[in-house]
């Protein structure tokens, strides 16, 4: 076997392994959030980037194996960016045999007119694109709108909102539009960007660069991405832990008055004292006991003595 054949075989093996992992992660996300139901018509939004290509590819694979029946319709919005290769997506989708629609709307000119040179165009561009896609979804009777955001996007968005907007807010895997007319799903919510990138390369998807924002440096998101990548290298498993933490919130242990009713929280005068101590709260306090060099021993075995000797 030649070196070329060996490399090709290794690539196929790696691609199959990645597809299995991505298929499992997408399937888990769909099941966990009930993203796709029997009889759904899923409008798969295809931009021509690695994420949306991977999403379509994995959804088509799952469609063949799923115990339920659902339809997939690919939709691309041609925003009339200069140099956009209009033939690429139709040729790719024709080869796949997937039903698709190519929409044309000159949002590029609107964005260039409204946004000063050098400023980030992403916000306005995505808002215009979202409005068009939401409307078209209703036009074709789509019951779900699938977007290609992955786990890294979700985590980055959370930190962006924390650092720059003062909010604990990310991208939900499943979202009902404000008017209640459209249901948005993110099947790649459990998938890592580096897996998607490698899979896209191995599959040789015909990537279409975004001339409007693909080469535009979004400094804030870029800084957050760099931070997360550094953590991933220096502290393996930290990104996974962050995402797990996002799925395990406890409003009563936070400070958000909108998510938990602290105002009407009262002690029960009739409650029987069981000696229960809020373990999570103990490290936050600095109890003083002059008989123990200024500090009380909070070890569980000494907790009764601690309560007995503590004199505020």
Curated annotation (Swiss-Prot):
EC assignment: 2.8.1.-
Gene Ontology biological process terms in this record: tRNA thio-modification
InterPro entries listed in its UniProt record: Rossmann-like_a/b/a_fold (IPR014729), TilS/TtcA_N (IPR011063), tRNA_Cyd_32_2_STrfase (IPR012089)
Main location: cytoplasm
Catalytic activities: cytidine(32) in tRNA + S-sulfanyl-L-cysteinyl-[cysteine desulfurase] + AH2 + ATP = 2-thiocytidine(32) in tRNA + L-cysteinyl-[cysteine desulfurase] + A + AMP + diphosphate + H(+)
Extent of motif PP-loop motif: 47-52
Essential cofactor(s): Mg(2+); [4Fe-4S] cluster
Subcellular location: Cytoplasm
Pfam families tied to this protein: ATP_bind_3
GO molecular function per UniProt: 4 iron, 4 sulfur cluster binding; ATP binding; magnesium ion binding; sulfurtransferase activity; tRNA binding
Listed GO CC annotations: cytoplasm
CDD domains: TtcA-like
Keywords, comma-separated and alphabetical: 4Fe-4S, ATP-binding, Cytoplasm, Iron, Iron-sulfur, Magnesium, Metal-binding, Nucleotide-binding, RNA-binding, Transferase, tRNA processing, tRNA-binding
Positions contributing to [4Fe-4S] cluster binding: 122, 125, 213
Pathway noted in the entry: tRNA modification
Subunit text: Homodimer.
Function according to Swiss-Prot or TrEMBL: Catalyzes the ATP-dependent 2-thiolation of cytidine in position 32 of tRNA, to form 2-thiocytidine (s(2)C32). The sulfur atoms are provided by the cysteine/cysteine desulfurase (IscS) system.
Miscellaneous: The thiolation reaction likely consists of two steps: a first activation step by ATP to form an adenylated intermediate of the target base of tRNA, and a second nucleophilic substitution step of the sulfur (S) atom supplied by the hydrosulfide attached to the Fe-S cluster.
Annotated protein name in UniProt: tRNA-cytidine(32) 2-sulfurtransferase
